[in-house]
Amino acid sequence: MIKLFLTDVDGCLTDGGMYYSAEGDVMKRFCVYDGMGMVLLRQAGIPCGILTSEQSPIVKARAEKLKLDYLYLGVGSKNRQGSLTKLGAALRVCDKLGITLKEVCYVGDDINDIDVLSAVGYPCCPPNARPEVRAIKGIHVLKTPGGQGAIREVTDMILEGRE
């Protein structure tokens, strides 16, 4: 049974595009269906969180709006001199909750997600994920692209499985 839901941001919660203003400000587009899916999971007692390699105030604001339980900014796939990896962050959350990685659903789309996707019990990726990600043994390739409701597709499957 899934006891924790974690996801990457770019390419999963967003379409992977980055919008820049003339002043150099960055904007990201999030799908409201994905946000509602995580709200519904939290209401069902399943904590939710984000693991991203970016240090993004946009992502922080989105996580706060959704009242997500966990937010790890600036975590990558490789340990950079004292920095936490995505897998390390996932393990830290599991330790806090007293669960194993096999009870975690993670959605990722790029090579910096491979370690986490290979370790969790329910790995998922949008169809726009990198070929290396789609090739992970046991991964569930979603029908919906990132940023267009991919996360909602997963959260609905999790909730339907609990009924």
Stretches found by the model and what they are:
Residues 1-84:
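Alpha-helical substrate-recognition element adjacent to the catalytic core
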Residues 65-66, 70, 76-163:
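Mg2+-dependent phosphoryl-transfer enzymes with acidic/Ser/Thr/Gly-rich catalytic loops
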